[in-house]
Amino acid sequence: MGNNITDIKQLLNDETDEKHFSFEVLPPLKGNGTASLFRNIDQLKEFNPSFINITTHHSEFVYHEREDGLLERQSIRRRPGTVAIAAAIQQRYGIPVIPHVICSGATKEDIEYELLDLQFLGIENLMLLRGDKAREDRFFTPTEGGHSHTTELIEQVNSFNEGIFIDGSTMKHPGRRFVYGVACYPEKHEEAPNLEQDLRYLKMKQDFGATFAVTQLFYDNEKFYNFVDQARKMGVTIPIIPGIKPFAKLSQLNVVPKTFHCDIPEELAGLALLCKSDEEARLLGIEWAVRQVKDLYAHGFNNVHFYTVSAVSSVHEVMKRLVETGLLQQNSK
């Protein structure tokens, strides 16, 4: 039962009962090399990932005190290199990559140049996202000359796919069209007034051209199933890929709900309170994730996406246990 997926379109059209998994990585911090990133991928590649997502991080402002005592504001990007990292992963491993393209911190020109770079590199699959608001902002503020919403970004990519640049000029030799996915939120986006409104926006992104969606992480499968049911009733037909992150530390009981705006189920919270160390919490997180994934596979969601930040070893253990049950195939070494 090896993974024969070669691109995201094949994955989305796969009508077999074969189980798949994918995962997300972050570009290295500015000044760091790729060794740690590649070690993490090396741990997970043996389980035949369908694709690897690479996040994009907007610039942020820091303040430095000058010699005269005044503060000077400087724009920095802590994790640059998304396009280069995506290309390096694709070349090194031959695994389909899906880099994030975001509105946050980017002008339309920035995005156009990024799309050109991706096209030159033969990268055809994208995740289109608005991106997070800046730390110092209460609400999302678009960059001057940038986009306010994902749908605006989608429109730019659609025009690019038609060979039209933002200045109205046209490509002499248009490349292959980008295929793109979007984010969705089983427990609604933090800025949405309610889940119904959030689902309307997901439907709009589908109508604009999105071909799949990946969820924010969640720990309660029933909330995910309810979300999918409501989405289908509202006309959302694109594949919805569930996103999972193993619970890793005791502190996450409080941090995760605030950071990712998702609930910790009462059963999981109760079990976590019995843990006496981070290692016990990590083992609990692995058990819970295995349980989640088995249940998702049983309900027909044959691709599960993992968020791996600070959790690579846990995801590896989850994969090992799924292999032991026969749900996934591991490469022979």
Language model feature labels by segment:
Residues K108-Q156:
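Flexible, glycine-rich active-site loops centered on histidine and acidic residues
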Residues P28, S50-P80, K133-G145, A210-N226, ...:
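Glycine-rich, proline-tolerant flexible connector loops at the mouths of alpha/beta enzymes
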Residues E24, I52, L118, K205, ...:
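Conserved, mostly hydrophobic/aromatic
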Residues L11, G131, E144-R177, V182-A192, ...:
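Active-site pocket-lining/capping segments in soluble small-molecule metabolic enzymes
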Residues N3-N13, A35-S50, H57-Y93:
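Glycine-rich, positively charged N-terminal anion/phosphate-binding segment
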Residues T107-F120, Q197-Y201, N226-D229, K249-V255, ...:
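Catalytic cores of alpha/beta
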Residues N32-L44, K108-L115, P193-M204, G285-D295:
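Short, acidic/polar
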